A protein has these predicted regions:
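Alpha-helix boundary/capping residues
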Residues: 11-13, 59, 83
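A beta-strand edge to alpha-helix "cap/lid" segment located at domain peripheries
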Residues: 19-54, 61-156
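Bacterial Sec-dependent N-terminal signal peptides
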Residues: 1-27
Length: 156
């Protein structure tokens, strides 16, 4: 009887410990995600198509006001190639705030984004955007963007 009771107690403890999920430090994860976004912004200022694309998940969606949605990496690739082929195009952004899910596998960021385009005379037109990015944590611990939404801060 004592052996059975001891065996059941040990089994219960093992099951309880196995079901316990470590608490995610969402603040630390948010800081990591914000740094990933900053790194992505820096990558977007260089003509390295693959490095820029690596931040998106294969089935990501990009939504920009007044433009058709870009669904999937091939459509996003065409958009990025168009930007990289324009020497007068520059984009940058800075994350402002965000949140990480309690499970630590999803997050979103609110960001300020700026696109600068120079015309043939060299005059720069600056467009400011509010941006929402939704991220999914990968099995290897990296973050990939799954939804990217930009909206102009002012309407014409």
């Amino acid at each position: 009887m004592k052996t059975t009771t001891l065996f059941l107690a040990v089994c219960f403890c093992l099951v309880a410990l196995g079901c316990r999920q470590d608490k995610i430090d969402t603040k630390a994860e948010l800081e990591k995600l914000m740094q990933v976004s900053r790194d992505w912004s820096a990558a977007a200022s260089k003509p390295d198509l693959q490095k820029i694309l690596d931040y998106w998940e294969d089935d990501a969606v990009v939504i920009s006001a007044g433009e058709p949605d870009k669904k999937g990496k091939e459509a996003i690739k065409q958009m990025v190639e168009g930007s990289l082929n324009n020497p007068n195009f520059k984009i940058s952004w800075e994350p402002i705030s965000g949140e990480i899910s309690q499970s630590g596998d999803m997050g979103y960021l609110l960001e300020n984004s700026k696109i600068t385009v120079s015309d043939s005379s060299g005059t720069e037109q600056i467009m400011n955007f509010k941006r929402v990015t939704i991220w999914k944590k990968q099995k290897d611990g990296s973050w990939k963007n799954i939804v990217d939404v930009m909206s102009p801060t002012t309407l014409k």
